[in-house]
């Protein structure tokens, strides 16, 4: 009960600090909100449940399972150890040895073996703690050197931030790639198919046959009954299509094949256009349906918009790391323009709408305009019935003119050639709009560089064109870049907001502005550890790594609270103890719980940081950020926080009335309960 009551309030405040840092996650928007809100909720409820169990179940189990150990909890090694105040702590090792040798049964021998391991571990740990106390005493005696070293580490770490790079989410090896192939405008479907065969042979020259699971070609427009507005395909005519290559499980990195194919295909097929789009559902969601993560939109009704888009394309293609740069829309697609003679059509009872609907049904079937179903009474299944003119009957312009035009009030069909003239011309193959305005999209992928670095240079190119735009034309960047910037702004503000919330929570708990300031002195070390871990592991700064930073801040604050709280308790219990001795005692006593808490989190995050398994690369930055932050934050908590405490708490310490009453009630501080 003494041990549980002593750390009840510090443990509760530490738990709240870990929970509070996740509160800003609930104010995020976009994709990051849906990805990380479940994680935040899971951590919050798990921490609250663990605190409840640690206050109820754990003391009960200690009462019944550690009955023989209760008289030895506050002891160390046989022969004594050097306490931080210079005294010698002696223990009676005879009773413990007798208890180890007493049982002779199988279970007793196992317990004896485990007890022996425990004794050896304690022996090593006490040696470590003795060295730590000596190192901490040196730091307390040389505060200027410690502050200078801490400041230098923070400055060096801040200088590394520009070298980290920024990404929205880390790239995931999906085991497949999606290649879009576009032949010159007007290429017939048969010719496009032949070009696809040649591209397929080039792919098999790069990717070994034993690593290819299957290759799927989708040439031309989709022919399903689903409206094209709901299709994820970016094919726009018979001159282009997609090749989806799925790889076997044990394959080389997909990015390596993609890089080689980019160079080879552009070299072997200079008259064709190639770009790789997102193959997996996660990347497609992050791109919001756009084929590439970078989308520069030229919006406006001015006909010069397409020329501006091509000029931007030429500039962006020169940026290192920008690949697959292309203008999504084509404006030179061959088509046939049908000019209806409205006077002639009106004379025989037809309208331009009747002519357009007849041609649409004849060329594209009635499946979209007038769907009809036939019920098979034998099996009860409805079958869609569509009417369409066979392609071999409209191979020439004269065949198209011979298309019969019908209407409900027309006594007999009328040939299209009698109502309209047909002429050849060029027109846009695809027309896109954004906010009702026509738009041209300049799309770009990123290779061998971070998305943020490429996006910054693209933004400079876009800014250089804004002063040259015609009236009514606008430039904007969308896609994954826009989501990344908004998520970074939200998480960055959330990180600052979390620190402020934790600080004010501790102000309320400690009834002081100084103690919370001392506690958050562990946070610079956590941020330095995060930066160094990301830099050394080659990990970019992204949304998962920022989530890891938030988690590391919560745990580092919790450990720092334990140290400062114990130092205050020591000064309450011993009125004559100065801040130097209180900080030394706090480090000596809290070494074990601080290391245990940090190691538990680090070991738990280690498998995640390795990025093992399917899609493990996506969560690896989170684990690496937590591990790096806690490694340095633990050192900062054990060395720098006591130094700051000894400096800022030099004056006479005044105990809180509740703390003093609890101290008198329980008879002082129990070191075993702290551990």
Where are the language model's segments positioned?
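Extracytoplasmic/periplasmic membrane-proximal domains and adjacent transmembrane bundles
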Residues: 313-498, 502, 507-510, 574-585
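Transmembrane helices with small-residue packing motifs
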Residues: 26-35, 70, 147, 151-187, ...
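Hydrophobic transmembrane alpha-helices and their membrane-interface caps
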Residues: 27, 45, 49, 501-590, ...
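Transmembrane alpha-helices and their membrane-interface boundaries in multi-pass membrane transporters
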Residues: 8-27, 34-118, 243, 525, ...
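Extracytoplasmic/periplasmic
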Residues: 96, 163-246, 258-263, 302-335, ...
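Signature of alpha-helical transmembrane segments and their immediate interfacial
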Residues: 5-7, 82-170, 213, 217, ...
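Short, hydrophobic beta-strand segments
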Residues: 176-185, 226-249, 285-310, 334-346, ...
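Solvent-exposed, membrane-proximal periplasmic/extracellular interface segments of envelope transport
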Residues: 190-288, 293, 343-369, 373, ...
